[in-house]
Amino acid sequence: MNETAWLDRVFSNTSLGHRLLDRLTLTNLRHAFYLISPYETTVESIDDVPNYNAEVSAWWLVFLTAEFFILFISGHEDRFALNDSITSICAGMLSQCFKFGGRAVAIFLYVIVWDNWRILELPWDSPWTWIFCLFFQDFMYYLGHRAVHEAGFFWGLHTIHHSSEYYNFSTALRQAAIQDAGLAIYDCIQAFFIPPSIFLVHRYFSEIFQFIMHTSLVDTMGPLGLVFNTPSHHRVHHGRNPYCIDKNYGGVFIIWDKMFNTFEAERHDDPPIYGLVTNENTFNQIYLQFHALWDILIFKGFTKDVKGEPMFPGVVNKLKATVFPPGWFPGVPVTPFFHWMSMVNPAHGVPEPEKPVLRYSPPARILVKVYVASSFLLLLAIFFHFEYDRNHLSYLDCTVKIAYFVVTMQCFGAFFDMKWYARYIEIARCCGVLIYYGVLMFDHIGAGTHRLFVISLHIMAIALWTTDVLVEKLSQCCSKNQSINPEKGDLERAPEIASISKNVQ
């Protein structure tokens, strides 16, 4: 008897269920905590390095679900929100879309440097090379992470990760789509002596390890926190309290922060309040991804004070505004660090968070919440298929699917921001999907069951929002007609109503 027959019934016409369950292994669980050895992860070629992000993704779903359940039953439902979590996970999907084969763009630059300019060729099969890379790459991560906070427009490559006003596992996935471009220099420094395959292994696991740092469920971890990064240390990093600003950059190890005086312990009498010093107040994915970079490069240098005077007078100050720390203004002391300038006092000008904390969360109808949550699950399923199959897809297929992801995420943001046009762009999106699947009907697969299922869902979505719009318009017309044509009884009482209104005024 087929042991997975029940799975075939539950996940008919798709292999997604099998793919996820196949990855729920103890080995992948161990990988999620960076519990690996040189002997199981050392390979000669980068082509032999698995996509470890995809391997542990099933466990990430388990962690996310378990955390939400624990927070809910323990009375801490204020530590997560549907709109925030969906926005965060969508950001993670978008960041993966801009990586080739799941590997960071930096690996291609890395190989070029290694092939042409390496100074020393450490043996790829030596455990000592593996161990050296573990520490050296984490130090490079510290430098890169610090740079995207302090080195001017580099902050625009990282802002979205700190834009969440919550701190949970979904926040870990709130990644910038183009951050790898800013971190490439710190990756490529390793290419002068570390073999590409060893670099890539630790690159994967360094990123994977960051996921488990993003939770409020784990308190301090005692002696482990003296050497390793912990959720407590990283909570400080995400805080917008003055004492939290520009602290705790470490990835796996916290020792770099202690060496360079950027370490700060979590204060239980002043717990971190999460988000940005000035929060974004939107769930628009594209805006969250790119606006800070645009603002720093284009607008910051032309900022004026309340009197209308330029805050960055002269060309030099305007240029400094793009490369000096985000909180810098003329007269604020800075000091050089590596290739950028660092604030002498990172908390300069940072206000204390408001009390009580006010989070941006426009009240959405139950219909909107249920619809977006359901659409998100469909998007997530399509994305997992995309991640597993992307190496076999044509450039056209990849482009179309990425466009689908982006437009769908924008629709989610419009619904969560309660934009008047949300329903209209959702109807247009669904029509676009129907046109796409209509074209696919003419290929060799034809009208497959899974295609008909997706088409049916989008037809129902169009009907739902078209009906919703028509009902609203009809209601508005009725209200308008009622105000223009009042009932006879109201006309008879008009003098009395006018008299009351006059007295009130």
From Swiss-Prot:
Organism listed in the record? Caenorhabditis elegans
Q: Which reaction does it catalyse?
A: 1-O-(1,2-saturated-alkyl)-sn-glycerol + (6R)-L-erythro-5,6,7,8-tetrahydrobiopterin + O2 = a 1-(1-hydroxyalkyl)-sn-glycerol + (6R)-L-erythro-6,7-dihydrobiopterin + H2O
Q: What is the residue range of the motif Histidine box-2?
A: 158-162
Membrane topology (UniProt): Multi-pass membrane protein
Question: Which molecular function term from Gene Ontology is one that the record holds?
Answer: iron ion binding
* Top-level class of the enzyme under EC nomenclature: oxidoreductase
State what protein this is by name.
Alkylglycerol monooxygenase
Transmembrane domains' residue ranges? 56-76, 104-124, 366-386, 396-416, 430-450, 452-472
Q: Quick one: a GO biological-process term for this protein? A: lipid biosynthetic process
- Locate the motif Histidine box-3: 234-238
Record key words, sorted: Endoplasmic reticulum, Iron, Membrane, Oxidoreductase, Transmembrane, Transmembrane helix
Q: Name one Pfam family in it.
A: FA_hydroxylase
Which ranges carry the Fatty acid hydroxylase domain? 130-262
For this chain the motif Histidine box-1 maps to: 145-149
User: Its Enzyme Commission number?
Assistant: 1.14.16.5
**Cofactor(s) annotated in UniProt:** Fe cation
Q: Which family does it belong to?
A: Belongs to the sterol desaturase family. TMEM195 subfamily.
